[in-house]
Amino acid sequence: MGTFLLLMAEASAVGGELAEGGAEGGFGLNTNILDTNLINLAIIITVLFVFGRKVLGNTLKTRRENIETAIKNAEQRAADAAKQLKEAQQKLEQAQAEAERIKKSAQDNAQTAGQAILAQAAVDIERLQEAGAADLNAELDRAIAQLRQRVVALALQKVESELQGGIADDAQKILIDRSIAQLGGEV
């Protein structure tokens, strides 16, 4: 601060000399570069110090507040992101557990359905076998009945042909004796 006052005092002295030179002969030009630079620097520094301190202070204060706000917002977003990540991980774990439960349930249902289909197939096969056996027995009974009818028809045809030709006396006597014996009589 003392240096600044010294510079101000020198600037005033130089300014006074310029004023005296201008009063003597009018407007004068100082050709001493070092003196003019010091005066210019002193004026600029004074203006900057007086007016710039407030502007610079306000700018720095605003910038600091903006940085603090940005840091707080970033920290808040980071905390929110961490919270959302934790929630998402919990939801993922729940979804994986649910998917595993659904998969196990589907496997159990598939196994149960497979067993039910196999059991139904076994019942259907047995029913078809029984139906086939019943059809086979019915066909066999029908074939036997047809054979009996045919045998009876052939036997009747033979008997008729023999009856038309007449029965021999010996065969007639044997037939009569046999019929009487069956009725319970004696010959």
Curated annotation (Swiss-Prot):
The chain crosses the membrane at residues 32-52. GO terms for molecular function: proton-transporting ATP synthase activity, rotational mechanism. Keywords: ATP synthesis, CF(0), Hydrogen ion transport, Ion transport, Membrane, Thylakoid, Transmembrane, Transmembrane helix, Transport. CDD domains: ATP-synt_Fo_b. It is a single-pass membrane protein. GO terms for cellular component: plasma membrane-derived thylakoid membrane; proton-transporting ATP synthase complex. Pfam families: ATP-synt_B (PF00430). It is found in: Cellular thylakoid membrane. InterPro entries: ATP_synth_b/b'su_bac/chlpt (IPR002146). F(1)F(0) ATP synthase produces ATP from ADP in the presence of a proton or sodium gradient. F-type ATPases consist of two structural domains, F(1) containing the extramembraneous catalytic core and F(0) containing the membrane proton channel, linked together by a central stalk and a peripheral stalk. During catalysis, ATP synthesis in the catalytic domain of F(1) is coupled via a rotary mechanism of the central stalk subunits to proton translocation. Component of the F(0) channel, it forms part of the peripheral stalk, linking F(1) to F(0). Belongs to the ATPase B chain family. F-type ATPases have 2 components, F(1) - the catalytic core - and F(0) - the membrane proton channel. F(1) has five subunits: alpha(3), beta(3), gamma(1), delta(1), epsilon(1). F(0) has four main subunits: a(1), b(1), b'(1) and c(10-14). The alpha and beta chains form an alternating ring which encloses part of the gamma chain. F(1) is attached to F(0) by a central stalk formed by the gamma and epsilon chains, while a peripheral stalk is formed by the delta, b and b' chains. HAMAP family: ATP_synth_b_bprime. This is ATP synthase subunit b.
